[in-house]
Amino acid sequence: MDHNMFCFQCEQTAGCTGCTSRGVCGKDAQTAQAQDRLTGALIGLARAADTSPDAGPETWQLMIEGLFATLTNVNFDPDSLNALAGRVRAEKQRLVPDCAVCTAPCGRTGDYDLAQLWGAQEDIRSLKSLLLFGSRGMAAYAYHAMVLGYRDETVECFLSKALFAVGEDWSMEELLPLVLELGGVNLQCMALLDKANTECFGKPTPVHVPFTVEPGPFIVVSGHDLHDLKLLLEQTAGRGIAVYTHGEMLPAHAYPELKKYPHLKGNFGTAWQNQQKEFADLPAPILFTTNCLMPPRPSYADRVFTTAVVAYPDLPHIGAEKDFTPVIERALELGGYAETQHRTGLNGGTGTTTGFAHDAVLANAAQIVEAVRSGAIRHFFLVGGCDGARAGRNYYTEFVRQTPPDTVVLTLACGKYRFHDMDLGTVAGLPRLLDIGQCNDAYSAIQIALALAEAFQCGVNDLPLSMVLSWYEQKAVCILLTLLHLGIRNIRLGPTLPAFLSPNVLQYLVEHYAIAPITIPEADLAALLGS
């Protein structure tokens, strides 16, 4: 490929084919090349781990960090990416020291050139891309569990196995089972993260979260990392500083060990793709703990901080010591708003309710089962996934708005910002709109579906349940593979289908799982209710 770069891992990729000069996400060619070099080094490390008995927790931790750093909207800093690649190569040299001085290198532990992948036969490229991008998504979940002290050797070893396979000359018949295996391992990884979050922060319970911003100094925290939020809440306690969540951090309010802090006040803003407008005049610092960071505009760049694997050139970074003093001092310096700010969601709502994870929902299992049997609840819709800037995403707003009053809408991840401030009322004494949580809380949605299937003594595909999903980045890929691993059929996916799905691979998914693209809300609702 004769391009400055090549990347087609996210939903917004240029022309639905691939970014070749600059990423739609905002990364430049230099950053894309650094990500490819890091990925190539990770594949080299996986090759070394395959031959060395000394591979262990330190090896897997580097793989997890490296994969997470290449996720969309995480790391835009070539220097940071190159430094991480250097650490990866140093670990490889530790595992196979003789390879560094070999006079006749065999290439079995060498770095992989990603140009080989991007230029491969389209079906091979498609399956390897599913494997690589799904691994990046799963690594994000493994990272969040890891920082809480929870690890799973099966998950970590599989990531190495997947990276190794990307660098091999394998056939479709060899790659396809590994792609589907990733879905099963990711289910195990999401279960690990669910265990980590609930044991560290308590089981989520439903809570109303206001969009109002009170006067005085405050900090906005974006991303997914609950551990970082907890540390910030501890360090700001008693300082007269309020903390507001943003984006995927919203479900943090439902965890008892987080909501016990009275200065965790509410949620600021709408979905991640609106941040450049919403942060423009913000009199407060913003801390990014994970994706989705967009290139900050000059109007607010002096107020943005990063931590963990997130990085952007010239932005201050909070290191592993997690001393948030610079963020706190900036909040006090900026001072916040002088008067209360009454903000709304995209549909005019002044707040939202979150916290309907599997424990909270299944506590009402008997009531739900009876409501289905009596006909009070006709159908469940899982409308969730990533949000993004593509115009067609208003489909999800209209789909939810048009769901009949005898149906329940389950939602999760940042796609909910399209409709989570709507008042859909109640059905059978339950809210019609149930926000399960972050994208990794797809695990909760799966547990709810499995419990209902057990109650009705049927398979998940036989339930009055339809999945209408939106995707943007690589965590959506591993979740989709998990649903396929479970044999779930008739998923509606949008707003566009992944550019990395070749016609043959897409046809396989259609034939075996009946995956279909979204069309228009009215037609899809009629079809799904008819089924």
Q: What does each of the following model-derived ranges do?
A:
Residues 2-20, 27-31, 35, 181-531:
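Anaerobic metallocofactor- and corrinoid-dependent redox/one-carbon enzyme cores
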